[in-house]
């Protein structure tokens, strides 16, 4: 009886390990040269940029306008910018930009109430494209 229980516990542990290994997934999305320290946790996508706050702020506004997001709220406070957008389905998109003390800028993206990793990555890549465009064409500033 005791041996049967040990076998069942061992089988359950092996099944749990296999299930956990199948749930782990690597990030297949290509990262950009401008973006460092990308992380996704608890519905918020976070990335650091080697750029200025002014350029990243402008890139966020351009990318969201290109995605036809409607601006609902805009807040500036010292080294922090906060935007709340809404898409055509009524889903909120929150973007926070914070200037870091050691240089660079940190951006946080949250799409919807629970977060959406794939959409956040797509928005991050669109913002990075806009930032690259702003850096290469100085007349666009």
Regions found by a protein language model. Give the residues of each.
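Bacterial N-terminal signal peptides that target proteins for export
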Residues: 1-12
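C-terminal motif of bacterial Sec signal peptides marking the signal peptidase cleavage site
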Residues: 18-22
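Ser/Thr-rich, low-complexity intrinsically disordered terminal regions
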Residues: 24-141
């Amino acid at each position: 009886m005791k041996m049967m229980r040990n076998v069942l516990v061992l089988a359950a542990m092996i099944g749990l390990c296999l299930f956990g290994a199948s749930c782990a997934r690597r990030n297949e999305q290509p990262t950009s040269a401008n973006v460092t320290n990308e992380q996704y946790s608890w519905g918020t996508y976070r990335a650091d940029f080697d750029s200025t706050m002014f350029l990243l702020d402008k890139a966020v506004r351009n990318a969201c306008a290109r995605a036809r997001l409607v601006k609902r709220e805009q807040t500036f406070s010292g080294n922090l910018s906060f935007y709340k957008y809404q898409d055509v389905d009524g889903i909120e998109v929150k973007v926070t930009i914070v200037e870091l003390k050691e240089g660079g800028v940190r951006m946080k993206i949250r799409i919807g109430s629970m977060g959406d990793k794939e959409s956040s990555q797509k928005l991050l890549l669109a913002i990075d494209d806009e930032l690259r465009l702003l850096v290469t064409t100085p007349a666009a500033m």
